[in-house]
């Protein structure tokens, strides 16, 4: 079947979405269990939300995207739909504003969690993933989200894997994907490398297995080549300030100097250190190496000529450091610093003075050069270490140029150079420039920009991930041997070969035993018939490491543009139609890794000419976490997880949607409170009852003013994603309409449209019951007349026993009797006053209503 160009379709998604006209039109009550599935079927059968880009550029477009979920075995809990509901409200609102909308959903289905779940349940991850996706999809459809399901994708789909591997090959060809021996947290029991965050007290967070620091061959992505642009282009984005700050900190750009110290007795002659304070160079009293530094490794060998006791002391210290993660090392160093004297000395690049070289684990091999020049007078870590081991502490920067014989603490602020020879008297910034100039003249240093950001360790020694599309030559001891049958061989990892693009995707073999082992080659090494192959009489071996879970999520927003395209990842027409992503919503926990990696891949594709924008996500919003009723994070272990199926069964999807939006600001952390759901149920039922009463063709001035004020308020709040206050405004308006003998038809119809993004099933049903035959999904959004909004009607807070319990709309000239009737008509007030004596009623005109009951 020919591929459909999704950017150019012209079908009318509004057609044929109404339920059968034979269904009852005047129900006595609102039955969510019957109404909601009926409208979900109507939307699906009519393809109501199929994304269609109009040929009219005046319509505009919005690409509204959720961070797609990892489909876990437990399905959704009520915290998951919060962000999805927010994007659905925005998508429905944009459609009604006449804007073309792309709103899609897919599955981030590869990775360690899926594989561990499969191992624990004794099933294959392909089977568990398929079941989990089915559960998630059922739940999302149950909640009435307006996704274009024709674009659904999964990162495990071979058609998707093909293009993930294709992007890797572009990175490889550009020199951005390479192999290196790096020190990693290796867990033999889990059979994979762990991040620092996954190691606690030398053991894995999952399963408490021993973890060791060891060098392993890894595939790396050269994200550092894009460090400057990743930092600079943050200014282009409408993102939360906290997330921008996190990314800047993670990238960690710093300016300083790279300085060379000669090492006596070392064959390589010198080591380099980076410092942001070259002005303190004259205060160096020792140099510190990370346990992983090549000089440290050389020192433990017989080649170094060091005494056996000295070598053994260094060897033991390095071994102890290998059992700790970087995080543990830094935490331990904050309490008590440890180290060992190597017996080697470094030569100061300007004075020629010899200073001792130590090994200490507060210096990390993965940061900077893995060596630091220690200036204890002006660095707190160095000061503590020098105090512990009796090393000299020299003041070379003074606040005002005066000298101090003894320092009680490191002075770390700018000042004036002292005891610095030719640099004495120079202010800090001037001294930095002078020291760098002197080093450059001597050929022993230069100005340098450094980053905390490290290249991305990309490979995983697990089964459930995208195979890396690389293979290597195999050298056989016996030319007639077969490596699949155990013939002695050597794999030439130093000669990586890219898989031909026409051969993609390279799919995972159906491996029955995919358990990890202590072999760093990973489980795929056991699939010998898959791993080894012959071509032109020569043997080759496939790469057996797989990609991390981050790979598929780095570019999924692009595949959504054109998911059925088998000729390219996405067409230019599809890209031009929808990119960039206008609104991206997801958890703040992804503020660094996923978002940084996706930006990196996008910039590579930008440089290669495949995309036309330097950044993929124009606006980013983080929804706040919904806690359990115990104010703790929802988890099965705490027993505080609330299943959305139960809420929908009892009250309906619209109630769940509105309750989650009414709980508080979208970005706020908030606890689930089951007792408050009934208030939203009453609001829904009151909307239904009000809109199904006999309607009037006339509208009084007070209702007209309140209608226009409500439209303005709800419109502005949706634009600002302040959904809780939008719902509150509608509640106030419904209270007003319900007090009328016969609500105006015009006001009711506009109310239905206002409610529809929040409670779409209810709105569709009411739209049908008020005589409309087609879905309201593309009806024009209500407009307001500013003249009706600037008048003498005010929103007045109502206090009961000192606490604000609601708000009423009153004219400035309203009498106390009118204020009393409006305030006591509020549900919340009536409930609090029920069965109690009204002791006091105070109305401050235009300001507040205060009620005291007891």
UniProtKB/Swiss-Prot annotation:
EC number: 6.1.1.4
Subcellular location per the Swiss-Prot or TrEMBL entry: Cytoplasm
Motif ('HIGH' region): 69-80
Keyword Cell inner membrane annotated: no
Binding residue positions for ATP: 636
GO terms of molecular function: aminoacyl-tRNA deacylase activity; ATP binding; leucine-tRNA ligase activity
Motif 'KMSKS' region in this chain: 633-637
Reaction catalyzed: tRNA(Leu) + L-leucine + ATP = L-leucyl-tRNA(Leu) + AMP + diphosphate
Top EC class for this record: ligase
GO biological process per UniProt: leucyl-tRNA aminoacylation
Pfam families: Anticodon_1, tRNA-synt_1, tRNA-synt_1_2, tRNA-synt_1g
Chain positions covered by the region annotation Disordered: 1-32
Biased segments, Basic and acidic residues type: 23-32
InterPro entries, per the entry: aa-tRNA-synth_Ia, Leu-tRNA-ligase, Leu_tRNA-synth_edit, M/V/L/I-tRNA-synth_anticd-bd, Methionyl/Leucyl_tRNA_Synth, Rossmann-like_a/b/a_fold, tRNAsynth_Ia_anticodon-bd, Val/Leu/Ile-tRNA-synth_edit
Keyword line: Aminoacyl-tRNA synthetase, ATP-binding, Cytoplasm, Ligase, Nucleotide-binding, Protein biosynthesis
Annotated CDD domains: Anticodon_Ia_Leu_BEm (cd07958)
GO cellular component terms given for this protein: cytoplasm
Superkingdom of origin: Bacteria
UniProt-recorded name of the protein: Leucine--tRNA ligase
